[in-house]
Amino acid sequence: MDRISGLPDELLVEILHCLPTKEVVSTSILSKRWEFLWLWVPKLTFVMNHYESDLPIQDFITKNLRLLKPQVIESFHLQCFSSSFKPEDIKHWVVTTISRRVRELIINYCDLSWLDKPVVLLDLPNSLYTCTSLVTLKLIGHSIIVDVPRTVSLPCLKTLELDSVAYSNEESLRLLLSYCPVLEDLTIHRDMHDNVKTLVIIVPSLLRLNLPIDGAYSCDGYVIVTPALKYLKVPGLYREDFSYLLTHMPNVEEADLSVEQDVERLFESITSVKRLSLFVLLDIEDESMYHNGIYFNQLEHLNLHIYRDNWSKLLVRLLEDSPKLRVLKIVVDGEPSFDEEFEHVSWIYNDESSVPKCLLDSLEVFEFAGYTRRPEERDFVSFILKHACHLKSSSISRLSCYVLE
C-alpha cells in the first residue's frame, strides 16, 4: 500500500479509472490523501436494485456529483430498478452531468411502484437534447419517456440506444434522429405501448442498425432510409400486418434478418452484402420467390436457418446468385411437410455447366444441421460433396448438437 501511495496523483486516478465506482469510492477511507482522490475519476457507474437500501445512495449521488473535479465526465451510468427513486432526482443528476460535458450517458430505469400504484415516468431534461458533448446515449426501461423538444442538436452523438422506452408522440423519435448528423450506431428495442404507429428512421450517416421487431407490438409500418448502412439486424421485419419502406442500401456488408414474407423486396435492398444470416419462415407458395436479376456478387458467408422443410427452392436460387460464396451453413428446423402441392427440387445436374458457380470456384466450408435422412436431404448433401471442388471442411448433424454461429 505504501508503494502505491507513493505514486503521483495523476497515475493513481488512472488506476482508479479502471475500477468499479463502488470500489473507487471505498478508497476514500484509506487516508487523508485518498479521501477526495476519487472525485477526479471521470467515469461513474451506480447500480441500485430493489432489494437494496436506496436512500443512502441517492443522497450520496446528489451530494457528490456536483463536487466532481474533472471538467469533462467521460461516462455516467445509472442502473436503477427501484420504487424509492424519484424521477426528479435522476433528472437533476442528468442536468449536472450535462453541465460537465458528459460524453457517455446510460440511464437504465424501471420504477417498480407500478406493482401497487401508477408510475411516474422519467421525463429527461430538455438540455439532454442539446448536449453538444454527448457521443453515446443509451436510454433503457419502461419508466422512461422520450419527449423531444422543438429545439434539438446533438452534433457529436454517434451511438444511440432506445430500449423499451415510450415516446411522447408520433414525431418524437423522428425529430430526435433528424438532428443527429453524425449518428453511426442505432439500436431500438420497442415496447408495445411506446405510442408510435409508424416508425421512421431516416439517418443518412447511419452505419449500424439493430431493430428487433416483435409481432405483439402495435404498429402500422416502418420506414427505413439509411443509404450509408454497413450492418443491418432486423429480426421479424417482414410481416403481413404492417407496411414498410426499405430503400436500397448499396454499402451493406453484413445483415442478420428474419423473413416471414416478401423476400424479394428485402433482397433488392441488400445486394452488396458479404455476410448474410437469414432466419426464414415461409409458406409453401412463397418459399422461393424473388425475381431474376437480383445477384449477391459479394456474398461470401451465408447462414440460413429455415423453419420449414420446404427449403430447397430458396437455397438453390441463393447458390446460383452468389458466385463468390465461401461458407454455407444451413439449419433446417421444422416438421416434415405432407402437403401434396409441394414439389422438391431435383439436385441431380446432368450438365456441369448448370452447377452453381460458387460450388465449382469458391465454396470451402459446408455445414448442414437438422439432417433427418430424407431423400431430398441426401440428394442435396451428395450434390454439394460431389461438385464443391474447393471444399476444405464439411459437417452434417442433427439439430440438437448444432449451434449456428
From Swiss-Prot:
Residue ranges of domain F-box in the record: 1-47
InterPro entries listed in its UniProt record: F-box-like_dom_sf (IPR036047), F-box_AtFBL13-like (IPR053781), F-box_dom (IPR001810), FBD (IPR006566), FBL13/AtMIF1-like (IPR050232), LRR_dom_sf (IPR032675), LRR_FXL15/At3g58940/PEG3-like (IPR055411)
The organism's place on the tree of life at top rank: Eukaryota
Every FBD domain range: 347-398
Pfam families: F-box, FBD, LRR_At5g56370
CDD domains: F-box_AtFBL13-like
Protein name: FBD-associated F-box protein At2g26860
High-level lineage: Eukaryota, Viridiplantae, Streptophyta, Embryophyta, Tracheophyta
